[in-house]
Amino acid sequence: MTQQTMTPETKITEHFTYRELTNSATGRRLGLENKPNEQELGNIKKTAERLEKIRAWLGKKYGREVSIHVLSCFRSAAVNGAVGGSKTSAHRFGSAADIDAAGISNLQLARDIIQMRDDGEITFDQLIYEFPERGESGWVHFGCRHNSAERNQILTATKRGNGGKTQYLFGLHP
């Protein structure tokens, strides 16, 4: 699988397509290219493989197929800058996905991924429960390091009481 052979409908893994792993509404709106290079494409594939593990584990736990919706995975440098992302964001390199899961709250999704880690089923660099003060968290950030040690950080991103700036708290804070 190479960048030259990719079409929007190309399956990166069984349940995740090139389109959904490189989708960017901001990029489309601003006319920015959001195409990964070969190394980034390799990272996207590895990230999608971990998402498949999460999907399968959730299916077993809940006794039904559980779809994972990818809100954001890869971001080119231009797209990452346009959304105000950190220059070192794992999204920039295809090593993170902002996700939610059908029929499961984002808090429960985060707890389930932590349980998978505790059971030795998956590893991660960062798991971030994003913005729970909005009622239901907007998403769960699942970040990976494919070529170095992972920190297994569990964080909550919030704008509570910080003048509207995002702050990161260790642990899950519903």
Q: Which sequence ranges carry the predicted segments?
A:
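Short, charged/polar surface micro-motifs in flexible loops or helix N-caps
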Residues: 75-79, 104-106
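Short secondary-structure transition/capping motifs
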Residues: 40-43, 98-102
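Surface-exposed patches in mature extracellular/periplasmic domains of secreted proteins
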Residues: 62-72, 124-130
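Charged, often glycine-rich, active-site loop that binds/positions anionic groups
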Residues: 78-94
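Active-site acidic/histidine clusters and adjacent loop/turn architecture
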Residues: 2-67
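Short connector loops at helix/strand junctions that flank enzyme active sites
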Residues: 63-65, 92-96
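Catalytic cores and adjacent binding grooves of peptidoglycan-active enzymes
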Residues: 101-174
